[in-house]
């Protein structure tokens, strides 16, 4: 498979719109159309993690924490971030981070920790400034598949539920 369908699944799970302003989640290194066979999942990306991905033949590393938080001014290998990015580039391994959007999603990291701790009566301390809206589209049955396959529809779809109705 290519990297893009994996990104699509991750972004349905934790929409990028839930990412904090300071965060840098998403595909950080690599091309969405790259063909891969395996994915390595880690909390952080380090040179050792890239080496492990390489040794098992993983073409994508999905990490919780992004290796790059601030834009890189150079790529010379002078620090751990640059060396790790360079190692991933050399090995042809994509790097994808799913950070605060996974923390903030209703069924994400924070919710899971609260459940594991047995907490009750949880509420959001600082609601997101941007709210998400759900949009439903109704089309004749014969046109449903082309609409589902349209790239704009795919980008806009976070949760798609299929409902069929009979004639009016």
Residues of each region from the PLM?
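Hydrophobic structural segments
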Residues: 1-168
């Amino acid at each position: 498979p290519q990297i893009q369908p994996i990104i699509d699944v991750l972004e349905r799970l934790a929409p990028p719109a839930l990412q904090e302003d300071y965060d840098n989640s998403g595909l950080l290194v690599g091309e969405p159309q790259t063909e891969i066979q395996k994915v390595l999942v880690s909390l952080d990306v380090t040179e050792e993690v890239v080496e492990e991905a390489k040794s098992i033949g993983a073409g994508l590393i999905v990490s919780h924490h992004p290796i790059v938080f601030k834009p890189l001014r150079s790529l010379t290998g002078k620090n751990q971030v640059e060396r790790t990015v360079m190692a991933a580039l050399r090995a042809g391994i994509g790097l994808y981070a799913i950070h605060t959007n996974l923390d903030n999603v209703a069924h994400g990291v924070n919710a899971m920790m609260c459940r594991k701790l047995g907490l009750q009566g949880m509420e959001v301390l600082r609601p997101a400034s941007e709210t998400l809206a759900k949009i439903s589209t109704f089309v004749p049955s014969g046109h449903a598949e082309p609409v589902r396959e349209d790239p704009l529809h795919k980008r806009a779809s976070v949760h798609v539920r299929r409902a069929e109705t009979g004639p009016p």
